[in-house]
Amino acid sequence: MSLHLHDTATRTMREFHPRLAGVASIYVCGATVQGVPHIGHVRGGLNYDVLRRWLVHNGYDVRLVRNVTDIDDKILTKAADAGRPWWEWATAHERAFESAFDRLGCLPPSALPRATGHITQMIELMQRLIDKGHAYAAGGDVYFSVASYAEHYGRLSGQRLDEVQQGESTASGKRDPRDFTLWKAAKPGEPSWPTPWGDGRPGWHLECSAMSTYYLGSEFDIHGGGLDLVFPHHENELAQSTAAGDGFARYWMHNAWVTMSGEKMSKSLGNTVAIPAILQRAAAPEIRYYLVAPHYRSTIEYSEPALAEAISAYRRIDSFVNRVRQRTGEVGHGTVPAEFAAAMDDDLSTPQAIAVVHNAIRESNAALDRGDDRAANEAAASVRTMTDILGLDPLSEQWADTRGADDAAHHALSELVGSMLQQRQQARAERDFATADAVRDRLQACGIAVEDTPDGPLWTLKDG
């Protein structure tokens, strides 16, 4: 089976055929760097990182571009409220976002363009649209004329043209309330850049069209982003890009939200879980597991029990790989089972793929119990390869390179506890239950609870 992806534009599963053989080009809408990143922000970046890893595993040369929106109304407002320059505020939070992606194991993007670094490309795109009759200037603003492209507008989102309303009233200079802003005229005290139509700053939609085609060409393979971006952002991107003559994206992918109490996680609602805060409660790979284990098009309803379940599941993988390494020596990389490949080719069905991982662990633990170290090592090597595709390989250098002080402490603890549990398992195998119980009691005295499961012993830190 070859890779099939759910395409938002056609609302169907489509077989992936890249524009250029052996090359995959991906543009992902990144963050508006207005504040501290939360788990809802980073979910999409992790999902598209898994897509990238799967494509690389299958031999593709992948070029992934993720933008940074570093000029926006919210950035200006928050910077002013904090008494800081807007650019300083944006830069600080851009670093926070990149640190979050790095700590959660995202491969660095091929390019990480900032909106403010591509004003020239935006001006060129606006000029093309004006020349073709699809945009117009009014009072220093520049607008896209939806009526001029009515036959094609709405094909991504399914939005009816007679229901479209794009915010500002016609009093702002718009000819039609459906038209959307490409360029905003300068206001006193705000940053601005010169254009043939007056000083100002870019509109949100214009930025992504200019940057994606600049780095990936006028037509590229996959455009990704959150479900909330389908309309108006991606609809407007598609309209302005194709109206200008670009082929633009061949496939559209959208990841679902992280919610809390049924509502999308959002700073405006005050229901977010910040990355720095959650990293105090769980190790980085455990958080990544929590966010990539569900299907990317399925909503994640955040709860502490669900997070705890994900932590336990990842620790089973971590404990297993380290148990095999301690027992059999170095664990390399192995083959990918057909069931895992089939799951990943089916629109990145990570729940099924992870089920294959846990099945392999159960079989390998059985091999260890019967003394078949060779089979156990081969299975562990396969588990390493599967988890590496998901960005979850417990032995990956990415965790050593990105681990902060808290993660380093957890890793050291994991190694020590794993060694003690191996001693306990050996004692139980030799029916030396007194020694096994003594090891368990020592761990419990240190605040570590041990649970014997079909996948092997699982340890957790006790509350309090």
Curated annotation (Swiss-Prot):
EC number(s) stated in the UniProt entry for this protein: 6.1.1.16
Compartments (UniProt record): Cytoplasm
GO cellular component labels: cytosol
Residue positions binding Zn(2+): C29, C208, H233, E237
Catalyzed chemical reaction(s): tRNA(Cys) + L-cysteine + ATP = L-cysteinyl-tRNA(Cys) + AMP + diphosphate
Cofactor: Zn(2+)
Stated family: Belongs to the class-I aminoacyl-tRNA synthetase family.
Protein name: Cysteine--tRNA ligase
